[in-house]
């Protein structure tokens, strides 16, 4: 059997493919201006680095291209640890910032439902307005703020009490005894301020007469913490011709954004 040589037409095609591939490699290395092209083994090194500069687009944000100074620093093993220390010092504050707990700015679940308190009491010689607001701090503590304005003669007292507090006009010796529930009442006055002003004005019951009136404005801040069960608002007003004692215990199982309204 006589063997015939293969046609030479195939060889130029193979050579053309090889030249095309080599051109692609050379074109890929043209963008790497920070590499020494005259050094030996440059082609292999450039091919490896070209993969780093042109990675697969697996991330939305493109990886930053290393600066020339970074690679030159890393080439020397003596200066590598200094370079790594400098990079670490820059990245440590960012890492600490990322480790901080994220504070949610949205609404968190309150410990109880009621938030605002409003009480308006009007008589012939008295006009009393009491407003209250509770602020849940979200860390197991909450504050209760009271403000009341009264026009007339008398003393007003607004406080937080446990449910066992007896509603009565006069303080009896039995009501001062400490119970188990009152001992676990973890609420205290944090701030208190009272402003009083005296003036004369026309009487409500008889506009032809001049009456002596006293205006009182009070701000009280309570701070409560766990453990606690139920707290109540206790209002007491004493004047010459009018007495009022009221205890309001909100329902903790009912969550509502509307304020509690009390009138009398």
UniProtKB/Swiss-Prot annotation:
Q: Which GO terms describe its molecular function?
A: signaling receptor binding
Return the annotated region ranges for V (Cys-rich).
Answer: 179-264
Q: Where in the cell is it found?
A: Secreted
Q: How is it modified after translation?
A: May be proteolytically processed at the boundary between the N-terminal non-conserved and the central conserved domain in neuron-like cells.
Q: Which domain of life is it from?
A: Eukaryota
| Glycosylated residues, chain numbering | 86, 139, 149, 155
* A Pfam family matched in the record: Neurexophilin
Chain positions covered by the region annotation IV (linker domain): 170-178
Q: Where are the transmembrane segments?
A: none
Segments for region (II) = 23-90
Matching entries from InterPro entries are given as: Nxph, NXPH/NXPE
Keywords of this entry? Glycoprotein, Secreted, Signal
Indicate the principal place this protein occupies in or around the cell. secreted
Q: Does the keyword tRNA processing apply?
A: no
Per the record's keyword annotation, is Glycoprotein included, yes or no? Answer: yes
A GO cellular component term found in this entry reads: extracellular region
PANTHER family for the chain: NEUREXOPHILIN, NEUREXOPHILIN-2
Q: What is the stated purpose of this protein? A: May be signaling molecules that resemble neuropeptides and that act by binding to alpha-neurexins and possibly other receptors.
Record's protein name: Neurexophilin-2
